[in-house]
Regions:
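Sequence/structural signature of beta-propeller modules
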Residues: 19-140, 166-168, 528-532
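Long, internal scaffold/assembly segments composed of regular secondary structure
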Residues: 267-379
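Asp-box/WD-like beta-propeller blade repeats and closely related beta-sheet repeat scaffolds
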Residues: 133-158, 175-177, 182-215, 235-264
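Structural motif
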Residues: 96-107, 175-185, 226-233, 281-288, ...
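Loop/turn-rich, solvent-exposed surfaces of beta-rich toroidal or solenoidal domains
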Residues: 329, 381-489, 493
Length: 532
């Protein structure tokens, strides 16, 4: 196993012992009372939870350890509800054609709501596709099938969601429609899914919805691809709007289909009203005052440029680092061909802070290249947000090992989607960076070049002090568990073939520490024993 420890011994020792001292982001009381109420977990977007995860040992999972449900395609995440009056929890999840509720204990689908007018993808069609990719997920014919299968994602309209403390599930669509769904019987977790209310963004707020989050006083925050920000009261009776700085002409700045516009991803929120949004060339802090939105520096707002020679901007959702008395940052990867991990001072910049060499803005506190331990590496990009745990920031390599000569470079996403587990294409590399508060600088932590995470969003566990990713070995999908402090592989589970492709989904932990994630056609949970 090749793990490169890049930190000093003193820094490594500090990292090893910091788990017990980490400040977690505060719980938002208006979100579901669980560890995962929205994409990336909570408003801070860290992809880190407090509970333990699996602890091994390495094994090939038995069929009775794998719980799979057909949900239709593109269920990339699932929000965990709080406890209902009937004593149960459910998972809420949505995709191209439907919303589902899955029982927390049994993993059975207990309710479905199909989107009007959407093509319905049944299980027979799913099984045919899975069988084709199990037979062959490499070569020209497999790529043709991949084009066909990935083409249906163009119909994905409702990707960003938030689950409230009252079991209301908010869904933002690319048409600017925010819909609140709930239970036909609020006391029955298994009751039918019904539409409660709708809010349509005004026509002048153009662009698909590219993020949905909730402030710590319970207001929904929405961002559109063209740089408009909305604050909406959860009962949809009041709203405020603002446009980000430097967004003039954003309608003409997309570099591809939806998801390649001026704003490409979701955003983070802190408990003081700070909203952190990445646009094509800038990181923005917008202030929610409780009575409106502000981009005024006098209110604490700011805008800072980051490097973007690639031209498409960051592929990362901003993640917050540091709470309480800790140094506080917002973290992204930038738009360089060889991307950097970039830390911005979240609030005031220290008076004696000097602008870093090569950094385009004084607000940047740290900027290091993601080179996977190879100083000769010329290009690497990722579509995943930066996983943050304590002062650690972790990224994965999503650049395929090979791209067939007849495909343009822009088609690289295809190679890590339906073909992501194939040894010919699968990317390798996980890298961690660490903020050193004593030296006030960002440092390299470690690199593991033996682990492949083709397209999954990793998840860190505070209690286990591990990071989990859905990886691949020998064209089989796996769960990989790495020591957060050292990067060493602790164990792995072999899950199986193409039914269990992670396809850009989050690697999630439920309240009891069981791994679950989305697949091309459903959702799967690994029902293995978890140490308390």
């Amino acid at each position: 196993m090749r793990v490169i420890l890049l930190a000093s011994f003193a820094m490594l020792l500090s990292t090893l012992t910091q788990a017990q001292d980490i400040n977690m982001p505060p719980q938002n009381p208006y979100l579901a009372n669980s560890s995962y109420s929205m994409g990336h977990g909570n408003p801070s977007q860290q992809d880190a939870v407090s509970q333990s995860g699996p602890s091994g040992p390495s094994q090939t999972l038995r069929p009775d350890q794998i719980q799979y449900q057909h949900t239709g395609p593109a269920h990339f995440g699932a929000a965990t509800s709080g406890v209902y009056p009937d004593g149960k929890r459910v998972f809420w999840s949505n995709g191209i054609d439907r919303i589902v509720k899955i029982d927390y204990d049994s993993w059975e689908v207990v309710a479905e709501h199909f989107f009007p007018g959407a093509e319905v993808y049944d299980e027979e069609r799913a099984n045919e596709s899975i069988a084709e990719f199990n037979a062959n997920n490499s070569g020209v014919f497999a790529l043709a099938r991949t084009f066909r299968e990935m083409g249906k994602l163009r119909d994905l309209s409702n990707i960003y969601t938030v689950l409230g403390q009252d079991h209301i599930y908010y869904v933002g669509s690319k048409t600017g429609l925010i819909t609140a769904y709930g239970d036909a019987d609020p006391n029955d977790s298994h009751s039918a899914i019904i539409k409660k209310a709708e809010f349509q963004l005004p026509p002048e707020l153009t662009g698909p919805v590219m993020g949905l989050n909730m402030t710590y006083d319970g207001w929904l925050i929405v961002a559109t691809e063209h740089g408009y920000i909305a604050a909406i009261k959860p009962d949809f009776t009041e709203s405020y709007f603002i446009r980000l700085q430097f967004s003039d002409g954003a309608e003409e700045k997309e570099t591809g289909a939806t998801g390649r516009g001026w704003i490409r991803n979701g955003f983070a929120i802190d408990d003081d009203g700070g909203i952190y949004i990445a646009s094509q060339d800038h990181m923005h802090k917008v202030i929610w005052t409780g009575e409106g939105l502000s981009v005024d520096a006098k209110e604490g707002a700011w805008t800072a440029r980051y490097l973007n020679s690639w031209g498409e901007g960051t592929g990362a959702t901003p993640s917050l680092m540091g709470f309480g008395e800790e140094d506080q940052f917002v973290v992204i990867t930038d738009g360089e061909d060889l991307m950097n991990v970039v830390l911005f001072w979240r609030n005031g910049i220290p008076e004696d802070w000097k602008q870093l060499q090569g950094a385009p803005d004084r607000r940047i506190a740290g900027m290091l290249p993601v080179d996977m331990g190879d100083p000769e590496l010329a290009a690497l990009q990722s579509e995943q947000s930066v996983v943050v745990k304590g002062y650690g920031a972790l990224v994965v390599n999503n650049t395929p090992r090979n791209i067939p000569w007849y495909l343009p470079e822009q088609a690289s996403t295809l190679m890590i989607s339906m073909a992501g587990s194939h040894p010919e294409y699968q990317p390798y590399g996980v890298q961690q960076f660490v903020w050193n508060p004593a030296r006030q600088r960002l440092e390299n932590g470690w690199v593991n070049t033996d682990i492949s995470s083709p397209s999954s969003v990793p998840m860190a566990s505070m209690k286990s002090d591990r990071v989990y990713v859905i990886g691949a070995r020998d064209n089989q999908w796996t769960l990989e568990a790495l020591d957060w402090a050292t990067g060493e592989s602790e164990f792995y589970y072999v899950i199986g073939g193409q039914r269990y492709n992670v396809l850009f989904s989050g690697t999630l932990l439920d309240e009891d520490g069981r791994i679950h994630y989305g697949t091309p056609w459903g959702r799967v949970r690994l029902n293995t024993k978890i140490e308390p």
